[in-house]
From Swiss-Prot:
Species the sequence originates in: Rhodococcus erythropolis (strain PR4 / NBRC 100887)
One Pfam assignment: DUF150_C
Keyword Cytoplasm: yes
Entry's Gene Ontology BP terms: ribosomal small subunit assembly; translation
Position of the signal peptide: none
SUPFAM superfamilies attached to this UniProt entry: YhbC-like, N-terminal domain (SSF75420)
Composition bias type Acidic residues, residue spans: 178-206
Region (Disordered): 164-206
Function per UniProt: Required for maturation of 30S ribosomal subunits.
CDD domains for the chain: YlxS_C
HAMAP family referenced in this protein's UniProt entry, alphabetically: RimP
Disulfide bond entries: none
Name listed for the protein in its UniProt record: Ribosome maturation factor RimP
Amino acid sequence: MPVPSRERVIELISELVHAQGYDVEDVVVTSAGKHSAVRIMVDSDAGIELDAAAEISRLVSELFDSLEEIGETPYTLEVTSPGIDRPLTLERHWRRARGRKARIDLAGETVVGRIGTLNDDSVAVVIGGRGGLTVREIALGDVQKAVVQVEFSKPSEAELELAGGIPEGRAVPSDAVDLTDDSGVDSVEDDEAELEDVENEEGFDK
């Protein structure tokens, strides 16, 4: 019997994940023959750390093992953060992305700016230009698509101050460093990616 659908997995795990202080942002279920892979993306206002990802993975694995609808189905389970480039579709996404640069598609124009304070039905966006920094209020209902951008340099203190700062527990976008790690393999490290793109490397294979 294959692992249940994405919708069913979300239904099964949401209460468990919420009890740990996290939200289920998405679930991806893929199958290859008799084996399935389940990738669960979770987040909170303070992001997610390795220990928390491992604990959620353990709890979900125990839950799956106890369900008749999954039974002895072989599967691999991974718990991770959604990553910084996921679309901003809910108010909590905007709140957690405060201080990050985003590409915001509106009707007839695209705005690139730093996400600021979230209000009842709008968000402040700090926009840089030849005349300096300005703050524009954008109605959430006017946003067609918004995606946080990967950054390789730190924003100015003035820009961050106008945006309202970075939420507690989140990292400030930083310079790309350590282009070569100790193993000699080329890599680019971003402090935000290190904090937010947390994966349970051990996973659970069943």
